[in-house]
């Protein structure tokens, strides 16, 4: 391990380049494997319609910046498909890591920047990920803090302004990112708290807020120019309506979820504490083999357990939060300020997801290298690598988000240009291929089609438009879509949720799809196609 640390110290750029290659290779395992008909489709159908039919994807305008950029990429490269947008997502993550390495390598040792990078990417459970609002939000959040931090300590107001500008535009990636404006309090008090200078930094705070305002005005101006402002405001009203509703996006529900998430981090912290003290007792034996065996077995057990129960985020989050807190308490200098910035991102970037932790390890872009620096010495780095390797093995063994099963079982392709280069299970490929073939005589490009409850990918694969402004009408609040204007085609998924078992068939609850079934009955729809997975209904011929 000593030789590795010395190589990184003397050759930081070569080491970082090799790390990026490793991380891209790791992501490649998940770029080409796994097929998701819900989340990925939700974004892709928005990119396809943001310019030519924005009203059909109104709900996506709560992620306006992401939708706009995705639409621009699809407009320039119309044949990218699912694979292309997965590559874009992976490259965006690597670009963010590059920015962090370039700007912070004089503050944080290169070995910890590299370890942090590996931990962030390897710790992301919900693979494969495509270019989406979650990734863009985390990347812009981290980049804004890096510029803000550099601006404060280089006394460069342009960088502070730029950091604020990125915060401003990032509000339109996810509306809850408005909480990032709270970074102004760190800017305001950083001298008083960490530099023992008893005054507040009004000037930097002013530049930061001006930057935020310019960012908001820039996106607002784009909306006006593109004719998107009305659609955005309607989508925003729907979001506020959902916050007061009874679904998973209810405000009180999300507050409870986040509070529960923070409480759940206490258990891993206690486990860390216990293992550290047991480890000290083992070290007194002064038997190197026993010491190594204890730590490796402990780390492997923890890694395999948390990944098996999908709580890897919590144990990583707890470790990183502890590192940021220690950094702030130990360092009454620039590094302490960076620790507070990283902790703020770790705490608040995740807010707004209905299950709190759905952005995975990406909110830890800054916290990971800081925690590595504070909690790990050179001898303990091998245990972090053991944890990372265990997680990598679990990714290969357990499969992908919404497409479970080992990667090596995903050998089939879907017969569609948009999914070229993507492999999935035999069952999934059969389900999509037979459905696309069966509905083809009844569905044309540009038609309006409801994919109930949340099979948005079917809209994208058929190049149809969602109805009522929502491509996942059963994925959040059905009241947002219904009542529906006109009589669109209805593709009814027989499985209640498009998750890991979306090709499974079982007896449905009578309440499942009650609203859409009532709509179909009321308007005398005809069933024209059915298989084990989907039913296609078309309106009566006028």
List where the protein language model places each region:
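Extracytoplasmic catalytic/substrate-binding loops of multi-pass membrane glycan-assembly enzymes
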Residues: 29-46, 57-73, 79-83, 225-227, ...
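Transmembrane-helix motifs of polytopic, lipid-linked glycan transferases
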Residues: 87-109, 143, 274-277
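Transmembrane-helix signature of polytopic, membrane-embedded enzymes
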Residues: 100-123, 289
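Membrane-interface transmembrane helices that cradle and orient dolichyl/undecaprenyl
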Residues: 105-110, 142-162, 170, 194-196, ...
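Membrane-interface alpha helices of multi-pass inner-membrane proteins
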Residues: 124-125, 159-175, 181-186, 214, ...
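Short acidic/glycine- and proline-prone juxtamembrane loop motifs at membrane-interface regions
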Residues: 129-138
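Short hydrophobic alpha-helices at membrane interfaces in multi-pass membrane enzymes
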Residues: 147-169, 198-210, 287-294, 333-342
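Short periplasmic/luminal acceptor-recognition loop of GT-C membrane glycosyltransferases, typified by
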Residues: 398-478, 486-498, 531-537
